[in-house]
């Protein structure tokens, strides 16, 4: 979700990444592959979805394969909830090169998806 937040912010949206079980820091592979295309997410801080329950949102998007199961309902205030499952690159195994390639593939897929979302009137 940090990658999706990076693309959303790059598109000029106010965006926040939050998870049901946030990590302590942004995955360094995600930071690397986003830096490759000129987007700095090194300053992002993983947050819990619970931090946003009292906020109003136009759109809440879940992006991980397991998010639909572990976070089926966002109980905060939002107009639209959408889900698009992407493989979790944190599950990649192999050499650093192989793991980086998985992150690139997921990054590129998320970039296409965020670009498509821009076509909807609620964004």
Enumerate the predicted regions with their spans.
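Conserved active-site segments centered on acidic
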Residues: 1-50
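Short amphipathic alpha-helices and their capping/turn segments at secondary-structure boundaries
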Residues: 48-52, 70-73
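Alpha-helix C-terminal capping/helix-to-coil transition sites in glycosyltransferase folds
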Residues: 54-56
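Redox-cofactor binding/interface segments in oxidoreductases and associated redox assembly factors
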Residues: 62-63, 83
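Short glycine-rich anion-binding loops that position phosphate/pyrophosphate groups of nucleotides
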Residues: 65-68
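Phosphate-binding/catalytic loops
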Residues: 70-123
């Amino acid at each position: 979700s940090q990658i999706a937040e990076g693309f959303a912010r790059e598109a000029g949206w106010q965006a926040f990444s939050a998870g049901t079980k946030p990590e302590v820091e942004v995955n360094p592979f995600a930071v690397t592959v986003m830096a490759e295309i000129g987007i700095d997410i090194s300053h992002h801080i993983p947050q819990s979805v619970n931090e946003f329950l009292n906020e109003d949102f136009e759109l809440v998007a879940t992006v991980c394969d397991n998010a639909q199961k572990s976070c089926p309902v966002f109980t905060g205030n939002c107009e639209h909830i959408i889900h698009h499952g992407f493989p979790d690159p944190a599950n990649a195994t192999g050499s650093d090169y192989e793991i980086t390639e998985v992150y690139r593939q997921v990054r590129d897929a998320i970039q296409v998806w965020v670009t498509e979302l821009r076509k909807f009137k609620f964004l």
